[in-house]
Curated annotation (Swiss-Prot):
Gene: YOP1
Subcellular location: Endoplasmic reticulum membrane; Golgi apparatus membrane
Organism: Yarrowia lipolytica (strain CLIB 122 / E 150)
Family, similarity comment: Belongs to the DP1 family.
Cytoplasmic side: 1-35, 79-88, 128-189
Keyword Membrane attributed: yes
Name of this chain's protein: Protein YOP1
Transmembrane segments: 36-55, 58-78, 89-105, 109-127
Membrane-topology descriptor: Multi-pass membrane protein
Amino acid sequence: MSQIIDQVQAALQNIDKELEKYPALKELEKQIPVPKSYILLGFVGFYFILIFLNIGGIGQLLSNIAGLVIPGYYSLLALETPGKADDTQYLTYWVVFATLNVFEFWSKAILYWVPFYYLFKTAFLLYIGLPQYGGAELVYKAIVKPLAQKLVNIQPHGGPSDSLKAQAQSAVDAAESHVPQGHSTGVSH
């Protein structure tokens, strides 16, 4: 038991060291004699309790804020780095996030019966949004990509499908065949 307490204390000290970067937290720590790590954990705990209770539907808002703020911050950082790996992580995240929100919009009646849905959604969004877990890529490859390939016929190389291009071209050709000589459809090849 003593070993667990020591590990928790070490983790809290590491959190305090990381939070030294934020002047507002340092000032708050001076005003109230509580370590920054305890303030952060208290805020996070209160945040999750509000999501859990979902009073007045606030769980949905707080869940979406968690799904926007943390990955949004990392996305802005990723835009400033020269590599592509982090860009791919967050582009994938936003595709999964949007897919989840569209699904959620159309299934409110079903979600009403799922207890603590927004608590689970928040945990899921953090799982797919935090880079150390790689959850967005996993969900994308397992669910979103196969669904997109089936519904939109996206080819593995990532570009528009050849059959979709062919269908669009045949629609243009069919339209042009019905236009009298000398008139233009306004569509350029």
